[in-house]
Structure formats: C-alpha cells, structure tokens
Amino acid sequence: SRYTDNLSNTFWLNYTFFNDQVRQSVSEGRYAQRPVIYHRWGGLGSHRYPIGFSGDTFSKWTTLGYLAYFTSNASNVCYTYWGHDIGGHQGGRNDQELYLRWLQFGVYTPIFRTHALKSNDIERRIWKYPNFVQLREAVRLRYRLFPYLYTAARETYDTGIGMNRPLYYEWPEEGKAYQFEDEFMFGNDILVAPIYEPAQGG
C-alpha cells in the first residue's frame, strides 16, 4: 500500500469484502460453506485470494483477441481459475457475431460468466439475439463438458497448474508453441484456438 508499509491492497480489499459477505450471510441466517471472491486482475500476487477475471472490458473484436492471449497466460502468474465478462462489460453494440464468438471462447475458460453494465444498449440474454440457436448450443456444450471440467479442476487443485495454459507448458521444446500466443490448452486434452475476427463479408 502506498499508505502503509508492507500492506497489500489486494489482501486488505478481499479481507474486508469477505468479512462483509460473512457478516451479511450470518445476519440473514445463511452460512456459506464454500465462499468465493471474484476479483479483477490486481497484479502479481493477487492470485492468492480470489478467482480472477480480466476486469471491465470493452465489447470489441480487438478486446476478444487480446483476451485470448491474456487467458492463455493467466497460469504464468498463478491464476488457476480465470475468467472475463463474456461479451464485454461496456461500450460497443449488440453484435451477434461478436457475442457468439466470445461465448464460444468462454466455454473453454474455467469461469463461464456473461456480464455487462446495466444499460439498455447492452444485452447479454442469449434468447434476445437472432442467432439464439447457435448461442444456446455453446451453452449446452459447456454443460456437456462438466465431467471434463471437474477432472481438470481436480488436477488444478492437485498440481497448482491452471486449467488454461500456454501451449509451451505442454511442448516446451517446440519453438512454435511460443509463437501462437492466442491459442491455449484447456485441461490436458483440448487445444483452443478462438476466433476473434469477424467473418469476411460480414
């Protein structure tokens, strides 16, 4: 902290947030058996307390492209459970192709969550889009992957290696594994290469 020597801002924020959640739960007669803190990227060392996400992003193709890279490298800074606001948090318009590609990408991340600012200009409910059938299929694929996700989560728990990881974790001697920064492994058996550009001709 810039105010107190040897005090981590992330630790203090999460400590305060967690205690407030516990206080609210107890006062309402609820007792969380497995509480979770979901926190944006806070720098090196912030992986120790929360599940991480990329922060409030813009609904743009360039953002989706960057998140493919950012997600593949989350393991490098010890984020084993990582996510992002599927569809983007703010800005842009309701682009059905962008939302589909983002949702498909999100299927292969540990945290699968749509989210945005509360705004009449941003829609995240899949049934409101003309390509609902395709969006629904992506969600169904995520559900079909639950046994795989559970196995990958257990391996992450046992090894400390993230569910998403760069290709060079699997093939450290292969030079090309360092070149494809926007591709990553999802668990041991799925290689993900997200589409983050619109189709030619719209």
Describe each PLM feature range:
Residues S1-G202:
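Catalytic-domain carbohydrate-binding cleft regions of carbohydrate-active enzymes
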